[in-house]
A protein has these predicted regions:
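Short, structured segments at the rim of ligand-binding sites
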Residues: 1-162
Length: 162
């Protein structure tokens, strides 16, 4: 499950009756993940865990066993400074990289959400394009992150790769 994997990575997790609290405990550790149908690790969270592991201590592997071509977004994380190699349906992640803000394109809904997380974690400014994918699954995502204290806003702009 996601919470078990987060705990394995040295991320604090407290589960209540109707809420889960996630908190920083110290250095986040790398981990190996294989997506699986329920109750295994969810394929829909694979892009987000890859993004987290790119910034974790140590090397990690994430194998996508549910869908093909689910790692297309990795090239966008690389543009931000992530050190990730893709072999088939496996991402080999060389962690502890500080991501840098840049312009990236969202190839799909889940990857778009992961790129928002990467952009919020990066130093400098990031610009995400093709956010229509994000809008299909996350209503006013920028408002939710702003409510948590993030510096995020929506603007009209055309793709200008950096």
């Amino acid at each position: 499950s996601l919470t078990a994997k987060l705990e394995e990575m040295n991320i604090g997790v407290e589960e209540g009756a109707d809420a889960i609290r996630i908190f920083y405990k110290g250095n986040v550790s790398g981990a190996n993940v294989k997506t699986q149908p329920y109750p295994g690790f969810p394929t829909d969270l694979q892009p987000q865990i890859v993004t987290l592991l790119a910034m974790a201590e140590g090397d990690s592997m994430v194998t996508e066993s549910v869908w093909d071509n689910r790692l297309r977004y990795v090239s966008e994380l690389r543009r931000m400074g992530a050190d990730i190699k893709v072999e088939g349906n496996t991402a080999i992640i060389y962690g502890k990289k500080n991501l840098k803000g840049t312009s990236v394109r969202c190839p799909d809904l889940r990857a778009g959400a992961a790129l928002v997380i990467a952009a919020l974690s990066a130093t400098g400014q990031s610009e995400l394009y093709d956010i229509n994918y994000i809008d299909r699954g996350y209503d006013t995502i920028e408002g939710k992150f702003s409510a948590l204290g993030a510096d995020i806003r929506r603007e009209d702009a055309e793709w200008e790769p950096v």
